Amino acid sequence: MTAPAPKLLQPITVGPLELKNRIMFPPLTTGYEERDGSIGERSLAFYERLARGGVSYIVIGDVAPVMTASPTPKLATDAQIPTFKALADAVHKHGAKIALQLFHPEYDVPGVGRMVMGSMAAAKAAQEAKAAGDEETFAAKMAESNEIRNQAYAKLHHDMQHFVNEASVEQLTQIKEAIAASAARAQQAGIDAIEVHGDRLVGSLCSAILNQRTDEYGGSFENRVRYALEVVAAIKEAAPQLMVEYKLPVIMENPDGTPRGKGGLQPDEACEFAKLLEGAGIDMIQVAQANHTGNMGDTIPPMGAMPYNWTLPVAERVKALVSVPVATVGRVVSVEAGEKILEDGVADIIAYGRSLMCDPDIALKAATGEPIRECLNCNKGCVDAIQNRKYISCVLNAENGDEATIAIKPGEGDKKIAVVGGGIAGLEAARVAAKRGYDVTVYEASDHLGGQIVLAAAPPRKDEIMRSVEYYEKILPGLGVKVELNHAATAEDLNAADAAIVAVGAHDVVIPVPGADSDKVVSSWDVLAGKVELTGRVAVIGGGLVGTETAEYLLQHGCEVAIVEMLDKIAAGESETILPLIMSDFAEHNVEQHVKTRLTAITDEGVEAICTTEDGAEEPVKIACDYVVMAVGSKANAFDLDGVTVPVTCVGDCSGERTADIASAIRTAYHAANEL
């Protein structure tokens, strides 16, 4: 248990609203809404779960005031009002307040929409022709559909860079009116607040980097922020009963001092703008990172990319200049961090975004002192999903995204459960089984918990992943779970329980080529575990997640590295927000990348391989090296079930579903324990 967090739990008045605590869920694009942008069961369940967990203020991200093809919520017609009213009612039941973040995309929505509809119409005509046996018309209409679609994509790509400068004053006025109309609908639906999305189109107009206009909306600082202030005024006029918040995107600095983001204001201008916003009647300001770079990781950075609470210095400056509440967001991963920010008086409200996806009960646990499940900032299930237009989920929270259908069930009588293996899957199985009221014992053959997570935490920037293990070490004793280290479970141990969950993980494998038994060949797992120390030039066989991370680890320890990968690119499964960091590291250290290359032999001089060229030819490749590191995947471990008489379920890497995948480990363990 940790100390309760009294500052986080203090109420605060924001405009016309009384928030019961200082914990906020900031806007995130979830992908949970219906195809037309209205609120469906998945959205409703997700946001109500946050409210039930004690969050005081929830912002629905990227709500469009017009109908677009983008997978975001939309409040563009009166017909959508009832679904938003249902959302407001669900959140209000738990004492939370709810806001809509209104935004407009940075493109000509009607123009792109007409092109998309034209493409769909041509495709429909093609299918009708095909059904009638008219192959000539079918081919012509399909070609027409594809051509229009390609033109739509080209226009979209162009507009994302240039619409801010090409939009007419008339178009900007129409967009402003659409935003105001959406705010009026929100008020009618019982929504409590509107957050102006200060990034996207509005932020692009504010930006001295992106805004090259020469009219009243371009040039000087006053002109660049003019439209944003007009949007604020339009919202306040259309929905006078609502609290109005402004998300203030700021172009921060990377650790190397270079600018981070484009679609916002520099810190000095942001501070000046904050004063103008207060004068315009804004009730609250959320200081955030500017975006518009094409990489979501710039706005929502992965572990190790930016310091914790990295936007806080600007939030502190803004708070000193305005009298309205100021929220801070950005890698606030613990209750203690949020409490410290409030104690220091540098912000008034703490926005826990990814953290609340990971643990929606942060507010409740802040009151009791129960440890929270801290977000890893891995970005695998959430930010990558946003980038790829999929619905988001948290790798550590098997319920996330399916709150309507998944929850821990009450136990069925008194049961003893044996869990074999203290890796992440075994620990999650133990947690869920114990939450159901069962008597749980974890048997771990080694002297520590964590399994492969310990290896995953070794590469640069990845040490934060150990928070996943530390969480279980904190909570399992309080749940009554017994952990026996240095204990290889036996059939007798399992038979003493009513059921067993086996989570014995996987082992790494070696490609059986000539020379694979050489002393110069080592396992990537042994490298990451610190069992071997390599020097000189190293060839890493396998350019997947483990291979690339091992390569970075070796670079950090002074080695020269070459990577041999059979696929056409390395790090195929890595987070898209982390991949640029890896590639930058490789470029800085001149890492050789041999893709579409198959290992054939290991010799005293190095490795021999075959590379498939672009034209399909095969060419021999020789890479000189002092050591060869095998990082070619893993294979599920087997547990000897001879003599075991109780029901057994395998989870995690040994389940056969997918190895070296934390989301799979958590999911299989959760569901197995929930069905005992």
Regions found by a protein language model. Give the residues of each.
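Rossmann-like dinucleotide/flavin-binding elements
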Residues: G411-A445, E484-E492, A496, A503-K520, ...
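Rossmann-like dinucleotide-binding cores of NAD(P)H-dependent redox enzymes
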Residues: D439-L479, A551-L599, S655-R658
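Short polybasic amphipathic segments
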Residues: G606-I610
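Conserved beta-strand termini and adjacent loop/short-helix elements that scaffold enzyme active sites
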Residues: V329, N397, N486-A488, S524, ...
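Hydrophobic, well-ordered secondary-structure elements that form the walls
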Residues: I285, V318, I341, G353, ...
